[in-house]
Amino acid sequence: EEYGEETLNILRTNPTKVAKEIRGITLARAIDIQEKMLENKNIEHLMVQIEAIVGGLGLRKSLPAEIIKRWKSKSLDALKQNPYVLCKLDNVGFLTADRIAMERLKIPLESFNRKVAAIEYVMKENENNGNVWIEANDLVNRSAQLTECDCKQAIVDISKEYLEIDSKRYIANKKAANDERYIAEKLKRMLL
């Protein structure tokens, strides 16, 4: 009421004036309000930028907010650097992330991040069907179908830190393979 329509602008730009002239508001409180307002303004700006990337593709309206919740102020950079990080969100698969990457961010067809995301997608799909291990050629072929490019080298490149390859050329996510072995050992001990 003190400043009328200028209240928000004055709070945003001059918290000292607010603290001096409005009884009951300390300088610390006025600065806190100013910081929150600036933070909200930054989030609004970020939301608009992310909406420009993911909006209009028929995706859920909450996606920009989910992205900001996950990556905070680094959301835009994370999205531009590797749009396939979207696959880490619930109900965002490779095809959705790939559509955003290809249509909006013009990611190259042969992008390493794109190939890795396709490989992870195929492996996750395989796990969701109850299979920890996938035959190497099947992984290569299914990844190639998704990306329309050769993913063999990407599989080799990520295999040391992410994948486990057995002697029969079957491949598994290291964590899933370790979990499977742990469960098998537990069951074996229970049955003996």
Descriptions of predicted regions:
Residues L38, I43-I53, K115, I119, ...:
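Long, charged amphipathic helices and adjacent flexible linkers at domain junctions
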Residues V116-V132, L191:
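Short amphipathic alpha-helical interface segments
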Residues E1-Y3, N14-E35, I50-W71, N82-E103, ...:
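Helix-hairpin-helix
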Residues A65, N129-S143:
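Short acidic, hydrophobic short linear motifs in intrinsically disordered regions
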Residues E5-L8, G24-I25, S73-D77, A144-C151:
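Short, basic interhelical loop/turn and adjoining N-cap
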Residues G4, M47, F112-E120, A136, ...:
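Short, leucine-enriched amphipathic alpha-helices that occur as contiguous helical runs
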Residues Q145-S167:
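Charge-enriched amphipathic alpha-helical scaffolds
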Residues W133, Q145, D166, Y170-L192:
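ASCE P-loop NTPase motor cores of helicases and related translocases
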